[in-house]
From Swiss-Prot:
It is found in: Cellular thylakoid membrane. Belongs to the Psb28 family. PANTHER family: PHOTOSYSTEM II REACTION CENTER PSB28 PROTEIN, CHLOROPLASTIC (PTHR34963:SF2), PTHR34963. GO terms for biological process: photosynthesis. It comes from Prochlorococcus marinus (strain SARG / CCMP1375 / SS120). It comes from the Bacteria. This is Photosystem II reaction center Psb28 protein. The keyword Membrane applies. Its main location: membrane.
């Protein structure tokens, strides 16, 4: 069952909110139905908290519930993990709207802004 959170949070490990604030980039298909959000976490605490490589995905929690992706990769510098990159995919307009509600709550919870390039 999804955990309901008053503040929007992101987790790579169960029970541990990620404190590293990601860079987030969005892309959408021409018709706007599908798209992706790309997250890059530089030096996330999840990398220091995990010893056995057991990051299984990224979960995003807010007052509506949980969004989850299993598409997570580690980026290495000189053989040492330095960043986590995650991709969240939506396949409908309603999925996109749900993600945007999470993103706005996450931004508000973490003092972030939104800009279009």
């Amino acid at each position: 069952m999804a955990e309901l959170k008053k503040n929007a949070t992101i987790r790579f490990l169960e029970g541990i909110d990620e404190t590293s604030i990601p860079e987030i980039r969005l892309t959408r298909s021409r018709d706007g139905r599908t798209g992706q959000a790309f997250f890059t976490f530089e030096e996330p605490q999840a990398l220091s908290a995990v010893k056995d490589g057991s990051i299984q995905g990224m979960s995003m929690f807010d007052e509506e519930g949980e969004l989850k992706t299993r598409e997570v990769k580690a980026r290495f510098v000189n053989g040492t993990p330095s960043a986590l990159e995650a991709t969240y995919v939506w396949k409908s307009e309603s999925d996109f709207q749900r993600f945007m509600r999470f993103a706005k709550r996450y931004a508000s919870s973490n003092g972030m802004g939104y800009s279009e390039k």
